[in-house]
């Protein structure tokens, strides 16, 4: 996980990305080099996400359990930890404590 506490010289899309009846809300951040990230919050719940691109999920605060598509093992992540999700796949996430995250699209 990067040690930066803020992103400088970026554009932010004003409209929120709201998923699962408001259980997951994020905003898209656009970087000068064309890359993008989302900064978001997931409330305590169990969800199944699909990915287009590969993703790196960096947990800023909170706690979750994650099971990647094709795996039978759950992994637990907390603040300061991260996990990668392959593109064109799915993952289950069980949020145990409200999750503050940064998602990088790889």
Curated annotation (Swiss-Prot):
Signal peptide: none annotated. Pfam families: Ppnp (PF06865). GO terms for molecular function: guanosine phosphorylase activity; purine-nucleoside phosphorylase activity; thymidine phosphorylase activity; uridine phosphorylase activity. It is an enzyme of class 2 (transferase). GO terms for cellular component: cytosol. InterPro entries: Ppnp, RmlC-like_jellyroll, RmlC_Cupin_sf. Its EC number is 2.4.2.1, 2.4.2.2. Keywords: Glycosyltransferase, Transferase. SUPFAM superfamilies: RmlC-like cupins (SSF51182). It catalyses: a purine D-ribonucleoside + phosphate = a purine nucleobase + alpha-D-ribose 1-phosphate; adenosine + phosphate = alpha-D-ribose 1-phosphate + adenine; cytidine + phosphate = cytosine + alpha-D-ribose 1-phosphate; guanosine + phosphate = alpha-D-ribose 1-phosphate + guanine. Belongs to the nucleoside phosphorylase PpnP family. Catalyzes the phosphorolysis of diverse nucleosides, yielding D-ribose 1-phosphate and the respective free bases. Can use uridine, adenosine, guanosine, cytidine, thymidine, inosine and xanthosine as substrates. Also catalyzes the reverse reactions. This is Pyrimidine/purine nucleoside phosphorylase. The lineage of its organism: Bacteria, Pseudomonadati, Pseudomonadota, Betaproteobacteria, Burkholderiales.
């Amino acid at each position: 996980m990067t040690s930066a506490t803020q992103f400088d010289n970026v554009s932010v899309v004003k409209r929120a990305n709201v998923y699962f009846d408001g259980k997951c809300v994020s905003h898209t951040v656009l970087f000068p080099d064309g890359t993008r990230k989302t900064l978001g919050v997931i409330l305590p719940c169990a969800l199944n996400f699909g990915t287009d691109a590969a993703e790196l999920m960096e947990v800023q605060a909170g706690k979750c359990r994650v099971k990647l598509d094709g795996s039978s093992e759950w992994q637990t992540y907390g603040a300061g930890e991260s996990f990668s999700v392959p593109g064109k796949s799915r993952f289950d996430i069980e949020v145990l404590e409200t999750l503050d995250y940064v998602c990088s699209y790889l």
